[in-house]
Amino acid sequence: MSNAPEKKNQQNDPSPAVSLNDQMKRRFEERAHLAESGIEPYPYKFDVTATSKGIIERFDEENPEDVSVAGRIMAIRKMGKASFFHIQDSVGRIQIYLKRDEVGVDSYNTFKLLDIGDIVGVKGFSFRTKTGEISVHAKEFELLSKSLRPIPIAKEKEVDGEKVVYDAFADRELRYRQRYVDLIVNPEVRDTFIKRTKIVALMRNYFASNGWLEVETPILQPIYGGAAARPFTTHHNALDMQLYLRIANELYLKRLIVGGFDGVYEFAKDFRNEGIDRFHNPEFTQVELYVAYKDYVWMMELVEDLLHKACVEVNGKDSTMFLGNEINLKPPFRRLTIADSIKEYTGMEIRDKSEAQLRDIAKDLGLELDPKISSGKIIDEIFGEFVEPKLIQPTFITDYPEEMSPLAKKHRSEPGLVERFELIVGGKEVCNSFSELNDPVIQRERLEEQARLRQRGDDEAMIVDEDFLRALEYGMPPCAGLGIGIDRMVMLLTGEDSIRDVIFFPHMKPE
């Protein structure tokens, strides 16, 4: 072992004089030295019998537990005849005590070649150190994976009067581009994604417990629909036809309601060829639910119950912190029509106004509008600019103009409106729901009007889908539909302020 590569302070050297290339060169040399010494730097398996968290939770001073644990080295304190280091596994961290006289000189010298970031397996027993820390006293250890690239941004922390090197990773853009490093060095990031999984599992169980069927519908579609958005296009070579990545799965799920299912839902990847910001990613996750014989009023109550249960599951209480505000998700939520909301926050009355009058209202409010957009889009612009950001506590915005919602059923008592709601929380839309339009004649009229809007230049207007209309002509029962953006819901319940913080690998500009 005397010809081992020279190490700087026996760990990652944080000094600027040591470049990344120098550190990597040394690690490659260590890898080669290990292999030459007959030590496999990447063995095939290691039998794990315990986790860091389990060892700590089960610790009994009187009955030390024999354990076999594995993880990544996150801190090292090397001394002459004994060393301490911390390993991190999928559920936490635990300290390891390694003594030369117990593991043997050769093994101990091998340990001296290890770095922060290396993955090791340890066999030994649990004990408590003099400082009170539950640890593992190693009897054997094995290198499981040699890390050739140092974890970035070293920092020092004093432990028991000695300096210990830790690593951190703070640059947000680098964190998103190299999520694997982010997960290694920022445990709170891992916690966010664990919570995401719990939220989706709760929703899935909630829907299944009601007897509704989880289904799958096409991602590649010959006609896109179900939302107002620009699609991604692709080409099918064998069929020589243009296809679209779905922007929503609504129209296919409604076909299944026509087919006789009382309730269907799908956790779907949807794609919209639009901008990227804190609340939008071109590829996103959405769950859509359709339940026969129900309406949008019933769906509001379901949403209240579902969000409250998810909040309690993740946070252990009725509320969550989101964008600097404490959000109370205990039902009931406030309900407000879109017209009343605009009246309340701008003083302007939009009911029974012509397109020209709506343009004048927008102008008075200081909005500059695209001359091609129609009445529905004008109302949407006014709401989005002056109302939505002010709706912090959960609020159902209801009863939208017909033009804004071509797939929703006309309001049973308010001419010109439809039975639709959006839930706004923290100034952002979380979900969207309709009493679904099931009259095929009116649906055709609505989609043909959308086609006219496309001719006026609205490239987000929907396309006439003849097969969907044919399905409706067979008869679809009364139905309530719901779409929830999973990414935004996770942001809300975990307190994250960017959609990139709840998606493992968000889309980024090229480096």
From Swiss-Prot:
UniProt binding sites for Mg(2+) 1: 422, 429
Alphabetic keyword roster: Aminoacyl-tRNA synthetase, ATP-binding, Cytoplasm, Ligase, Magnesium, Metal-binding, Nucleotide-binding, Protein biosynthesis
Entry's Gene Ontology BP terms: lysyl-tRNA aminoacylation
Biased composition, class Basic and acidic residues, residue ranges: 1-10
Catalytic activity, reaction form: tRNA(Lys) + L-lysine + ATP = L-lysyl-tRNA(Lys) + AMP + diphosphate
GO cellular component labels: cytosol
Cofactor comment text: Binds 3 Mg(2+) ions per subunit.
Molecular functions per Gene Ontology: ATP binding; lysine-tRNA ligase activity; magnesium ion binding; tRNA binding
Short name of any one Pfam family annotated for the protein: tRNA_anti-codon
E.C. number: 6.1.1.6
Cofactor(s), by name: Mg(2+)
Binding site for Mg(2+) 2: 429
Composition-biased stretches (Polar residues): 11-22
Compartments in which it is found: Cytoplasm
Chief place where the protein resides: cytoplasm
Similarity comment: family membership: Belongs to the class-II aminoacyl-tRNA synthetase family.
Subunit structure: Homodimer.
Listed NCBIfam families: lysS_bact, PRK00484.1
Protein name, UniProt field: Lysine--tRNA ligase
Biological source species: Chlorobaculum parvum (strain DSM 263 / NCIMB 8327) (Chlorobium vibrioforme subsp. thiosulfatophilum)
Organism taxonomic ancestry: Bacteria, Pseudomonadati, Chlorobiota, Chlorobiia, Chlorobiales
Gene transcribed to yield this protein: lysS
